[in-house]
């Protein structure tokens, strides 16, 4: 509660979030019962969450985000290096960042983490595509996952959550395709045919259902290139099996490089996503933004 002594909470709500009204009701009850002052700001368009965070950061103790990874991406980018702690009320499809940080998916428990949690500094990635910067907490990528994001209808994501991606993902794997990737990691070039190229800040997907690669940490001052290069749909399924089993000893199909700066270009050009939001088309550059974000996470019991 000491983090809340500098002013009220600012609760930024994406009304398109899954169960937004129900989550807000739970959060209001928890904050009110604790005697904590809070303000609400409901977004109306892309970029609105970042505008709210930038405009009000100096007047509030904590910014709380109700939404998915895309809404969270906007807020942490706007607050980068401000030292302002960010709480999360998960309301997205995957909630990948919240899950990786141990945030409860149940609304009342997540709201209590806002009140009783501890601050945790974390790196961000700063992606530039088409001259525009986009911060991300989880990953930026091109390839099969981007096509899956683009082709899964919004109503399916709202109804089924992460399971809504499953059928689309299977279809993309069976409709197997690759592209030529030209990459640099800290100035060192790499060229490979690939089905997926990801710059990851967090390695765990859906509570370790999949692990993107070895030794990926969000607080080590580095990001991680994860290049997946199966030669067929059958090999692509094998790559997923390896990710589920955390077996990464297949250099002909899996390439991993840690670094601080990356460039990615593709032939043919590929759509780019950052934390679940489509942000442009290759080429793009990424830099690590060390310790840029501060999240409220659950206390660890002794």
Question: Predicted regions: what is each one?
Answer:
Residues 156-164, 205-235:
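Gly/Ser/Thr-rich active-site loops/lids in small-molecule metabolic enzymes
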Residues 71-82:
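Short Gly/Thr/Asp-enriched flexible loops that form oxyanion-binding sites at enzyme active sites
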Residues 1-63, 73, 108-109, 302:
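ATP/NTP phosphate-donor binding region
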Residues 12, 22, 34, 43, ...:
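Catalytic core of DAGKc-family lipid kinases
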Residues 15, 66-68, 91-92:
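Glycine-rich beta-strand-to-loop/alpha-helix junction loops that act as flexible
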Residues 43, 185-186, 191, 217, ...:
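ATP/nucleoside-binding phosphotransfer catalytic cores, i.e., glycine-rich phosphate-binding loops
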Residues 49, 69, 197:
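Short conserved active-site loop signatures built around small residues
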Residues 141, 145, 198-214, 278:
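Glycine-rich phosphate/pyrophosphate-binding beta-alpha loops
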